Amino acid sequence: MIKIERTSVMNFENAIRGARNPLNSWDRMDSSYDENGNFILGENDLGLAKRLAHAGSDHRKFLRQIFVSVDITAPLYWWKEFDTYKVGTVANSCSTMHKIHAKSFERDDFSCDRLDEGGLAALDALVAYLENERVKFCEDKTNKQAWHNMIQLLPSSYNQMRTVTLNYENLINIYYARKNHKLAEWHTLCDWIEALPYAKDIVLVKEKSEM
């Protein structure tokens, strides 16, 4: 399970202007904002962006200046893979260390959409145990054993929300590394990438021969 919310794409105008710095071609900028405040690439700017994006990472530095902020709720097992992307990404997460006891444990707190009946039964038993330990800890905050039981038994299917900041160059790397991954969560993220502004022009840039 993965939930992607509150997407915000920023700094298109400045990134495109910077892309024109090497040739001092600012007078050819033809982009504008629509009535909803969305940045619309003009024909000249879109052509430049596509040429640079397809020319390789050395030529498309402007993509590193197009920022994306998004809230992602996903299981810990997925976050372990996402954390391999360190360069150009920032993430603030909800804290399990400080807030694990703040709400009741429920099945919906875990990614279990692919479990069979036996797996769900095992998860339900663990959820009941975790909830029992949570109640113990809430009644007596000095009961460190109950807290340790929660922390060390929390399964990797536990869902955590993080606010993530990336850039379009990150998204190229993520998309082509993960679009055929066995985890369904990556497929959902890749679908989200495809739907971002101008992604089909400047993010989905690798030819089949390069993949």
Map each language-model feature to its residues.
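Family-specific signature for flavin-dependent thymidylate synthase
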Residues: M1-M211
